[in-house]
Amino acid sequence: CRYMAPEVVMGQKRPDSHTDRFSLAVVLYMLLFLNHPLEGKRTMCPCLTEELERKFYGSDPVFVWDPANDANRPVRGVHTNEIKLWPLYPAFVRKTFEKAFSHEVMVGNDTTHRVIEKVWQEVFTTLRDLTIKCSCGSETFIDPSQQSCRCINCGKSIERPPILKVKKYHAALAPGKKLYACHVQYDSDDFKEAKGEVISSRNNPSLLGLRNDSNNTWEAILPNGSSKGYTHPDRKSGSAGMPRPIS
């Protein structure tokens, strides 16, 4: 029952798309944080009976990081990985899990509004695109809600790079970062096909640019208000809107 939605555990409902979305959230949480989202100090019983299982996973589940209820927090020395990993992820990742395991979504009146697959796709696509390399050589996350971040490996403070924002997607503008169709085409959610790359100037490495590797023309709006199209010289051009970088 550890992977079942509370209403399935209680026998109130058979599995369907809504209950499957709860199970998906459990699996994703365990992949990232190496522990079950409902197992904290509250569930550390000498003998986990069937009655207690129905309570912890069915009638009265409590997310270990519930911002409104700390009754089931992870235990130091027991849930070590979870305690270490949770604060390392950007706020938008943590908030999505908080929503997925909120009381209302688990057992309240909002069980039909669980986090859908498309939202998870957007969250993890953005997480990938906000991953950059620290000077220590390790990869780390950039939190778009923070002006500065710390490397999750060495702890060094990292100044937030410019961030590209298109629709619900964000991407750190660091040399070598790929831009995908979901970044450069407003009607696309394709997060696999690379359409461009962030590059730095040969003469001034601190000056960044976007290289168009697609078959479309990117239209840039210049500081004076005029526009200019940029097309890869080796490709035929179509037309596509150009996303705008933000600081």
What role is predicted for each listed range?
Residues 236-243:
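Conserved small/polar residues in nucleotide/adenosyl-binding loops
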Residues 133-137, 148-154:
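Short cysteine-rich clusters marking metal-coordination/redox-active sites
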Residues 98-131:
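Terminal C-lobe "cap" of eukaryotic-type protein kinase domains
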Residues 207-235:
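Forkhead-associated
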Residues 16-22, 27-96:
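Conserved C-lobe activation region of Hanks-type protein kinase-like domains
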Residues 138-145, 157-160:
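Cys/His-rich microdomains that often coordinate metals
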